[in-house]
Amino acid sequence: MEEIQQQTQKEEQKHREEEEEEEEGPPPGWESAVLPPPIVTITAAVNPNPTTVEIPEKAQMVCGSCRRLLSYLRGSKHVKCSSCQTVNLVLEANQVGQVNCNNCKLLLMYPYGAPAVRCSSCNSVTDISENNKRPPWSEQQGPLKSLSSLRRAEN
């Protein structure tokens, strides 16, 4: 009887140890949120005055081929998708126009100067004319505020 109790206790202890060893990671597909870049202060022995270095800000876009969300350094002209290897052209806000699809009325974005745009939803082609153009995205949103100007406004 005593042997059975000892064996049961050993099995329970082994089971507890196995549970403690198992680490549950994040669920599949989970990615951490992108945080704004920190401002780094560098102090050198030669220069006792600290120097503030601004780390480049990140931006996001959707891959034109596989529709994955891509993060890149602001100011980049091209971004290569790590999933499908497509090189995407990065357009600034003042280089992008918007128009509603003639067929399904989906809001489409296109590079300024394009004569027409194909809808990614219904595949119809919408001609870009003066009567169906919207103002550039940058004009709709107003001037772009940098992260540093937002920090100054908070203080």
From Swiss-Prot:
Organism annotation: Arabidopsis thaliana (Mouse-ear cress)
Coiled coil: none
Pfam families attached to this UniProt entry: zf-LSD1
Record has Nucleus as a keyword: yes
Region of interest: Putative zinc finger 1: 60-90
GO biological process: response to bacterium
Function description: Putative zinc finger that may be involved in programmed cell death and defense response.
Sorted UniProt keywords: Acetylation, Nucleus
This protein's GO CC annotations: nucleus
Region (Putative zinc finger 2): 98-128
UniProt protein name: Protein LOL2
InterPro entries named among the record's database cross-references: LSD1-like (IPR040319), Znf_LSD1 (IPR005735)
PANTHER family: PROTEIN LOL2, PROTEIN LSD1
Residues with N-acetylmethionine modification: 1
Intracellular or extracellular location(s): Nucleus
Location, primary (coarse class): nucleus
Region Disordered, residue ranges: 1-35, 130-155
